[in-house]
Amino acid sequence: MDTEYEQVNKPWNELYQETTLGNQLMVNVGMEDPEVPLLPSNFLTKVRVGLSGGYITMRRIRIKIIPLVSRKAGVSGKLYLRDISDTTGRKLHCTESLDLGREIRLTMQHLDFSVSTRSDVPIVFGFEELVSPFLEGRELFSISVRWQFGLSKNCYSLPQSKWKVMYQEDALNVKPSKKKASKTDSSV
């Protein structure tokens, strides 16, 4: 199932976004850094960017995975980024298997990927190799993605950047609130 998309024609230094069917993806080219939820999907998520001349690369990518279930649900999977400019779906990056019952934040400086601004940016974000005792396990978490574009006159390849797990914690644990003691100790 291909994802429909709209053509985006705005100056490169302005913030713009593109909404796709099934997924929502925020493409951030400005200084602001908003978040838009990206629902888990194994379908294609294309990004089309209208820029004039040059090449673009993806940089400063941050992904937050927010569980909607307990860790006891046993939902896990690998986050893949794929180049779908042809039918092979070349793997750009893949994380290790992630426990999707925990909140996870991932960051990457850049993708080893460059594409002409006159074409689509054929990047797929999606979970594969999902493991869950429930058939609906793929829908038991949500993702938000933040990224920016780098613009260059030349096509170049960067050394592969690794995912960094910023932190992984049990997001469903109730954290005790920090309250000041209402009574003071009055010892005579």
From Swiss-Prot:
This is Movement protein. Belongs to the tombusvirus/aureusvirus movement protein p22 family. InterPro entries: TBSV_p22. Signal peptide: none annotated. One of its GO terms (molecular function) is RNA binding. The keyword Transcription does not apply. Interacts with host protein HFI22. One of its GO terms (biological process) is transport of virus in host, cell to cell. Transports viral genome to neighboring plant cells directly through plasmosdesmata, without any budding. The movement protein allows efficient cell to cell propagation, by bypassing the host cell wall barrier. Phosphorylated. GO terms for cellular component: host cell membrane; membrane; viral capsid. It is found in: Host membrane. It comes from Tomato bushy stunt virus (strain B8) (TBSV). Pfam families: TBSV_P22 (PF03558). Keywords: Host membrane, Host-virus interaction, Membrane, Phosphoprotein, RNA-binding, Transport, Viral movement protein.
